[in-house]
């Protein structure tokens, strides 16, 4: 056996054992079947992780476009420099394997355990992940109906994550870049590596703060207590991003970084509703009647987003299930 094959074998055995323990420990040992791919298959599919195959890139990992057995796939490769991500990589696989049964979660096909950190093989989505400002890398402007559809579908996915398993699972990293869009404009939640379970009978768990700046619940930031509210807050910011076309943190008038949440709060205090809304949202209207209906939808959407981020602390939402139901009702207003 060659030196390279021995190394792959060593990683395969080590990673396989850890993955098996993670899968058994998760969700009462009930997991969806996933395939194991060889490193040769992954390298061939991505042209040796060619830059030309990159879908999106972040500090911890890179998403690549590939083809395995004549099927287009998305391949997630963790950075070898981030070995602190070891536990998170396996949690990503274990939670993804459970969430794959939901139509609004990015389906995990399998993984490769022959690298220092496992690579994930997932379904391919035509439009890839959203940008930080809630748009597409192609520059295609998303119509209002698609934005509303994305919010409704991701709310459904997060609700499932919170309620479908023996323990409440909190995502902790809901943001536009973790939302993939397929050819039918169906939204898929991904990247479950920061997930944490709240044991039955407990209201919260304490853990280090995880997430992206601008999407982290302030209460979580100061107390380090993880509850469902962590995801509700992040989702509310995602709604504001979709509504405004702005990133969660953007350059203000003086080029200084500004929080979208703070910006929206300031505008709401002035009663300048239209200043919040992306002007592209009004571009596909058929007439005055359409405008009236659109404005009622957009205002209801904004009110719900503000409840999610607890703009008025006396009127919070009860949970993601309420958010998902409200978004369905808002969609029916059209």
Swiss-Prot record:
Disulfide bonds: none
Location in or out of the cell: Cytoplasm, Cytosol; Nucleus; Cell membrane
GO biological process terms, semicolon-separated: cell surface receptor signaling pathway; defense response to Gram-negative bacterium; regulation of growth; regulation of immune response; response to temperature stimulus
Site (Required for Pseudomonas syringae type III effector HopZ1a recognition and interaction with ZAR1): 231
Reported induction: Induced by the elevation of ambient temperature both in the nucleus and the cytosol.
Pfam families registered for this protein in UniProt: Pkinase
Disruption-associated phenotype: Reduced resistance to Pseudomonas syringae expressing HopZ1a. The double mutant zed1-6 zrk12-1 exhibits short inflorescence stem and autoimmunity symptoms when grown at 25 degrees Celsius.
Effect of residue 305 to T: In zed1-5; loss of function and reduced interaction with RPP13L4/ZAR1 and Pseudomonas syringae type III effector HopZ1a
Residues carrying O-acetylthreonine: 125, 177
Residue ranges of every copy of the Protein kinase domain listed in the record: 49-334
Keyword Translocase: no
GO molecular function, one term: ATP binding
Effect noted on mutating residue 231 to N: In zed1-4; loss of function, impaired interaction with RPP13L4/ZAR1 and Pseudomonas syringae type III effector HopZ1a, and completely abrogated hypersensitive response (HR)
Entries under InterPro entries matching the protein: Kinase-like_dom_sf, Prot_kinase_dom, WAK-like
Swiss-Prot/TrEMBL keywords: Acetylation, ATP-binding, Cell membrane, Cytoplasm, Membrane, Nucleotide-binding, Nucleus, Plant defense
Domain text: The protein kinase domain is predicted to be catalytically inactive.
Homology family: Belongs to the protein kinase superfamily. Ser/Thr protein kinase family. ZRK subfamily.
Complexes and interactors: Interacts with RPP13L4/ZAR1. Component of an immune signaling complex made of, at least, SZE1, BKN2/SZE2, ZAR1 and ZED1. Binds directly to SZE1 at the plasma membrane.
Chain's role: Together with RPP13L4/ZAR1, involved in the ambient temperature (above 22 degrees Celsius)-sensitive aerial organ development. Together with RPP13L4/ZAR1, involved in the regulation of the ambient temperature-sensitive intersection of growth and immune response in the absence of pathogens, by repressing the transcription of SNC1. Probable non-functional kinase required for recognition of the Pseudomonas syringae type III effector HopZ1a by RPP13L4/ZAR1 and, together with SZE1 and SZE2, to trigger subsequent defense responses.
UniProt name for this protein: Non-functional pseudokinase ZED1
GN (gene name): ZED1
